[in-house]
């Protein structure tokens, strides 16, 4: 029983415990539910509160917006009132210029009160004045107080501009307030952050930070400083200086003063540095100017030396061409002008005789060469070259006129008819330079005077011919003076008494004292008058004749030719006509037609046999010249070999072979020349090959082929010596050539052969092509 009771008690206790546990669980659940309900209630309350707050904010914003609108309306009304008031004031000021009317104080007050009632509050504030007798009297007494219209207009414009600025400021402020009222929290946060950053930037600029440090913050900087934006205070240094007791504000002021002093000191240092740099730049500029002047002087001497060098080279080329028998007209003229400076060289012919037989192309080349010599000589012998230019141009005009004479009657008339030209030449011929100059001045005066019947073409053509005759006369007189000087020097050196070089023409006194009137150039027709300026010639002719009679009258070249022709006619050099009885018995008489037939037969026989005047050497040179292009020139500079002994010298007389060599020159268009030159300004020509033609017609051993040997040049590695050896009876001959590698391919023009007594060695140099 006891066990059963115990068991029942245990069961009841376990039941009570489980019931208690269930109750506790239910109570905890109810408590959680109540808590969640309270939380939801609090959330709903907070939501309602936030809604009410947002509703209050929106209502507040609406009220503020309505207030701003009301303020705008009021400001517009005030602005309109002020504008009306200003109009009234301007009217009153314009009326104030008139004399004021006297009225009583009551009337003025009444009018003032009426105007105040009409103008509203702005008038009630006392911003307008009323006229009174006293005020008008005072204005009459002191006219300086009355404002002028210009001053009133200026004051009005200033007031309007001030009001406009105030209005703009007010509108800007209202817009900012409106934006602030309607901005979101994010925009507000961004605005405040931007304002803070601008403030920080201004602070950093004031602290002297550069642009590269502007983006640093306490959390983002390469120095790892969490207090970067704060002011660093060095307490130890302050204690050492004894200023640790100062407050932060005083320390900031002290640091600011120190920074200002440092800034001023830096400015001074920077100013001094800039001044030093400026002085240094000025010194460098002065030194550069001095250096330029020195270089200009140095280069000036170089230019002079270069011109003299080119002149020497041109004269040397002329000498070489004269020596080789291929002289150009400019070479002969250069030799003539250089012979004047030489003490012993004598040139018997006038320089313009070198133009005989030249074509138009040759004369044009001569003009270009004359210009080159004039530039190189720099003013020396300028009169000689100018006269030669005039004569050459006249000869070119004559040749072109002859070439154009067969083109028909459509040609333009050249001013002087062919029938009159011979008479003009006879008038100008034989006269001195002074006489021709007088005629030239007379023709110029006639052209300047003009006239209705003056043939300008005739007189201008005559003037052109006269210039050429004057140039010839001047060169002829210069030639005679040079001959006299050379003869005098030769006689002084040889100790011979002075005698005239040519026969003296003794002028008759009758001719000297009774001068005939000078011949006038024939006029082109009845419409043109003869030359008038003959009287000055007649006046000066006696004096000139006397001067010529006193000195030596030298025969000209034309006079010598005329004298020889006269001697020929007087001496009867032609066969004398014989009669039939004067002929010998065995004489065979031929009729003229028989003689002509025999002559023609002889000519035909001679033509069938070939050219009788062409020798073996001429044939050789003709063959050697075949295929000679524009890029090739004759090369005849021989290299002396010194005294060489030959074993066959006692049997055969050694002799040098004849040769005709050519050098091939051209432009090398490498990368450098392509960069710095073009076809208008080409680079200097270089030697690209040689063609040697050695003539061995009389070799003893016909089967022995001539040989060539290439030897190094001892004095210059850039050149080599090419020696030719053939055997008796010819000596070895050598030439100095450029030392470069040869092209031995026949496709590049290489030839080495001996045929018909001519040894030919043709070769070109290799072209180096540089590739990366």
Swiss-Prot record:
Q: Name one GO biological process term.
A: negative regulation of toll-like receptor signaling pathway
Which GO cellular component terms are attached? catalytic step 2 spliceosome; cytosol; nuclear speck; nucleus
List modified residues, type Phosphotyrosine: 573
Compositional bias ranges of the Basic residues kind:
15-77
Q: What is its main location?
A: nucleus
Provide ranges: composition bias, Polar residues: 103-112
Localization (cell):
Nucleus; Cytoplasm, Cytosol
- Which residues are modified to Phosphoserine? 148, 498
Q: Which UniProt keywords apply?
A: Coiled coil, Cytoplasm, Developmental protein, Immunity, Innate immunity, Isopeptide bond, mRNA processing, mRNA splicing, Nucleus, Phosphoprotein, Spliceosome, Ubl conjugation
Show the coiled coil region(s): 157-207, 247-299
Q: In which tissues is it expressed?
A: Expressed in cortex, hippocampus, cerebellum, heart, lung, kidney, liver, spleen and thymus.
- Say where the cross-link Glycyl lysine isopeptide (Lys-Gly) (interchain with G-Cter in SUMO2) occurs: 491, 506
Q: Where is the composition biased (Basic and acidic residues)?
A: 78-88, 177-200
Q: Which SMART domains match?
A: CactinC_cactus
- Region of interest (Disordered), residue spans: 1-164, 177-202, 499-550
The similarity annotation says: Belongs to the CACTIN family.
Q: Please describe the quaternary structure of this protein.
A: Interacts (via N-terminal domain) with NFKBIL1; the interaction occurs in a pro-inflammatory-independent manner. Does not interact with RELA NF-kappa-B subunit. Identified in the spliceosome C complex. Interacts with SF3B1. Interacts with SDE2. Interacts with SRRM2. Interacts with DHX8.
Q: What is this protein called?
A: Splicing factor Cactin
